[in-house]
From Swiss-Prot:
Belongs to the TRAFAC class myosin-kinesin ATPase superfamily. Kinesin family. Kinesin II subfamily. Residues 10-367 form the Kinesin motor domain. Gene3D superfamilies: Kinesin motor domain. ATP binds at residues 97-104. Residues 633-793 are annotated as: Globular. It comes from Mus musculus. This is Kinesin-like protein KIF3C. GO terms for molecular function: ATP binding; microtubule binding; microtubule motor activity. Residues 256-269 have a biased composition (Low complexity). Residues 378-632 form a coiled coil. It holds the Pfam family Kinesin. The keyword Oxidoreductase does not apply.
Length: 796
């Protein structure tokens, strides 16, 4: 077993180059990358270089050319990391590179072909094979799958994959995702099913450079908990966490813009390949520039973190600049062992992107992590499972569903065992039991399923016997004529109650046993049902494979060291046989130093050009965001009233954990919303809301029209009104002024009638009789209103 802690460990970086595609070969692009597998060097040639410019060389822990196999990468680079995770370390594997360089192929590969399987399916097989070969250890394996799409965290295993999750931080456990679903898996088939479900919901799309391009960063998390009894007799739990990261590729819109076809995005099929479908959040080609902007921003934040960690001069590490860097905080400079796979494109048109990837990977080599074993953490799910299983087992033993295991001889035989408590006296159970010679040796256990099946069968027989016995007692009670009918009925009811209690207890016991079996099946215990000979052979093959990989690594390191020493030896050699030899040696050394000087100058120039490109990309993203902000300000100023805007601004607050502005709830948390709302002030004491003017008018005792009436209680006056017929047929021949004066005179005569004239008036029950205005007032008010020649109705 490896040591529990190390002072520091460098981040392991490997480079992998894909072959030229048919499209690139048809376009006439040449190969500009050269991979030296033995020395671990990558040589990049500039297709636009001036005559005499030397190619750039980068050295990594390992390199894999276009002819490399998936198994070579996994066995030599990833397998030691998975072994460390099984021992309780945190581990991370992530692929970085330009879009279309084979990141998803490296991480996932082709699931249906064993030779083309990537890192993730090989890791599944490795983990469960190790568990099956282990001895005296209990394992619990759970898996989670998430993606970061446009800086939003989504759970790919949730029923609502588009729902946004929150990123939280705990001082003890570090960064975690709230409400992230996790599934306990028992074998390779189950964890592959979980992976395929997540792939169906992942956002992918088609671009010019890749038909199935990942539009989000995906992280598959495997947590392995192991319980093992220590020398002190106590169970110790180790927790290893493996992050398998498939990053979206960095891209430029002039090269990797959306396909001409546009249309919906595609999704991986259940087999891990690619198919067609509707990807979440990627419904049209118009989303591609926005997706690319978010991808490049998060990768730029990742580059800033790596640059700050590699420089050893920065006191602040900008982990909070992106969701991706916060989730990978432990993997970059923290408690984890990390492997970075830099994927490269060999074509000449990808020179700038390949150079950027190589520089990024070269900086990452200088990051130092501090991995340690996560032993006996507080929040382990395995410990909760063990405690719950022990509690259920105790209840089942108390109810008599589980038999105790006798320990005498080391032979297994079929024998009769006494029935547990609750069975009739003298009943026995035939079951397979294991007898051991040594009471302290518990390696050989009885076949538990056979024993439990026998116990359940006898429990059913016992229940049937009890039913028959109760039926016989009921029949005996009914035939007994010495008992009074009331006593018979009472005894029969007691027997029925006993039978019903027995049935309920049986159902509860069966539910308890089912829960116990379900929880126990989730715990994986190695060393069962495996042939020892085959097991030993597989272990020996793995050890040999690891020794070969370790030997290759040492050979590569020794060759790199020999090259450095040759240069030092050449510089230290100072004795020459003649002046001519000294001139030749120093001329050669001068040319070599001059070439190095030119390479450094070219590197500085490339760095300056790269800086200009990055700045232009950032300025373009900033201008795009500024345009969106101006558009939103324009909408707010023209369509939202100032008072509504102030209400919104007053509700805003900054969420420090998410670093985003949020709205405060309209109703404060903790307030009981079930209480009835108060009646508005304008309607207190009235049947309906009344304006302030109407209330003042009512208080002053003026016109009763301001009174609050209920029309349902209004008494109607059904008496017909007085009707007077007036002749206006000759008015058309007269002068209009004369006609108007005649009308006024008729109105005066009508108003000045004596009170004895019978005229019926109708008024509301709430109206009081009002004094009619004098004739002069009536004249003044009616002079400007011409009367239509029609029937006049007097309503007062």
């Amino acid at each position: 077993m490896a040591s529990k802690t190390k002072a520091s460990e460098a981040l392991k970086v490997v480079a992998r180059c894909r072959p030229l595609s048919r499209k690139e070969e048809a376009a006439g692009h040449e190969q500009i990358l050269t991979m030296d597998v033995k020395l671990g060097q990558v040589t990049l040639r500039n297709p636009r270089a001036a005559p005499g410019e030397l190619p750039k060389t980068f050295t990594f822990d390992a390199v894999y050319d276009a002819s490399s196999k998936q198994a070579d990468l996994y066995d030599e680079t990833v397998r030691p990391l998975i072994d460390s995770v099984l021992q309780g370390f945190n581990g991370t594997v992530f692929a970085y590179g330009q879009t279309g360089t084979g990141k998803t192929y490296t991480m996932q590969g082709t699931w249906v072909e064993p030779e083309l399987r990537g890192v993730i399916p090989n890791a599944f097989e490795h983990i469960f094979t190790h568990i099956s070969r282990s001895q005296n250890q209990q394992y619990l394996v759970r898996a989670s799958y998430l993606e970061i799409y446009q800086e939003e965290i989504r759970d790919l295993l949730s029923k609502e994959p588009g729902k946004r999750l929150e990123l939280k931080e705990n001082p003890e456990t570090g960064v975690y995702i709230k409400d992230l679903s996790s599934f306990v898996t028992k074998n390779v088939k189950e964890i592959e099913h979980v992976m395929n479900l997540g792939n169906q919901a992942r956002a992918v799309g088609s671009t010019h450079m890749n038909e199935v391009s990942s539009r989000s960063h995906a992280i598959f998390v495997i947590t392995v908990e192991c319980s093992e009894r220590g020398s002190d007799g106590q169970d110790h739990i180790r927790v290893g966490k493996l992050n398998l990261v498939d990053l979206a590729g960095s891209e430029r819109q002039n090269k990797a813009g959306p396909n001409a076809a546009g249309g919906p995005a595609t999704q991986p099929t259940a087999g891990g390949g690619s198919g067609s479908g509707s990807a979440s959040g990627s419904a049209s080609s118009g989303e591609r520039p926005k997706e690319a902007s978010k991808i490049n921003l998060s990768l730029s934040a990742l580059g800033n973190v790596i640059a700050a960690l590699a420089g050893n001069r920065s006191t602040h590490i900008p982990y909070r600049d992106s969701k991706l860097t916060r989730l990978l905080q432990d993997s970059l400079g923290g408690n984890a062992k990390t492997i970075m796979v830099a994927t490269l494109g060999p074509a000449s048109h990808s020179y700038d992107e390949s150079l950027s990837t190589l520089r990024f990977a070269n900086r990452a080599k200088n990051i130092k992590n501090k991995p340690r074993v996560n032993e006996d953490p507080k929040d382990t799910l395995l410990r909760e499972f063990q405690e719950e299983i022990a509690r259920l087992k105790a209840q089942l033993e108390k109810k008599g569903m589980l038999g105790k295991r006798p320990r005498r001889k080391s032979s297994r035989r079929k024998k009769a065992v006494s029935a547990p408590a609750g069975y009739p006296e003298g009943s026995v159970i035939e079951a397979w039991v294991a007898e051991e010679e040594d009471d302290n040796n518990n390696n050989h256990h009885p076949p538990q399923p056979i024993l439990e099946a026998a116990l359940e069968k006898n429990m059913e027989n016992y229940l049937q016997d009890q039913k028959e016995r109760l039926e016989e007692e009921k029949a005996a009670i009914q035939d007994d004529r010495s008992l009074v009918s009331e006593e018979k009925q009472k005894l029969l009811e007691e027997k029925e109650k006993m039978l019903e209690d027995l049935r309920r207890e049986q159902q509860a016991t069966e539910l308890l046993a089912a829960k116990y079996k379900a929880m126990e099946s989730k715990l994986l215990i190695g060393g069962r049902n495996i042939m020892d000979h085959t097991n030993e052979q597989q272990k020996m093959l793995e050890l040999k494979r690891q020794e070969i990989a370790e030997q290759k690594r040492r050979e590569r390191e020794m060759q790199q060291e020999m090259l450095l020493r040759d240069e030092e030896t050449m510089e230290l050699r100072g004795t020459y046989s003649s002046l001519q030899q000294e001139v030749e040696v120093k001329t050669k050394k001068l040319k070599k130093l001059y070439a190095k000087l030119q390479a450094v100058k070219a590197e500085i120039q490339d760095q300056h050009e790269e800086y200009i490109r990055v700045r232009q990309d950032l300025e373009e993203a900033q201008n795009e965001q500024t345009r969106e902000l101006k558009l939103k300000y324009l909408i707010i100023e023209n369509f939202i009233p100032p008072e509504e805007k102030n209400k919104i601004m007053n509700r805003l607050f900054l969420d420090c954990e998410e670093e985003q502005w949020r709205f405060q709830p309209l109703v404060p948390a903790g307030v009981n919303n079930s209480q009835m709302k108060k009646r508005p002030t304008s309607a207190v004491g009235y049947k309906r809301p009344i304006s302030q003017y109407a209330r003042v008018a009512m208080a002053m005792g003026s016109h009763p029209r301001y009174r609050a009436e209920n029309i349902m209680f209004l008494e109607l006056d059904v008496s017909p009104p007085a009707i007077f017929e007036m002749e206006f047929s000759h008015d058309q021949e007269q002068d209009p002024r004369v006609l108007h004066m005649e009308r006024l005179m008729r109105l005066d005569s009508f108003l000045e009638r004596p009170s004895t004239t019978k005229v019926r008036k109708s008024r509301s029950w709430c109206q009081s009789p009002q004094r009619m205005p004098p004739p002069s007032t009536a004249h003044a008010s009616m002079t400007s209103v011409p009367l239509h020649p029609a029937t006049v109705v007097d309503h007062d």
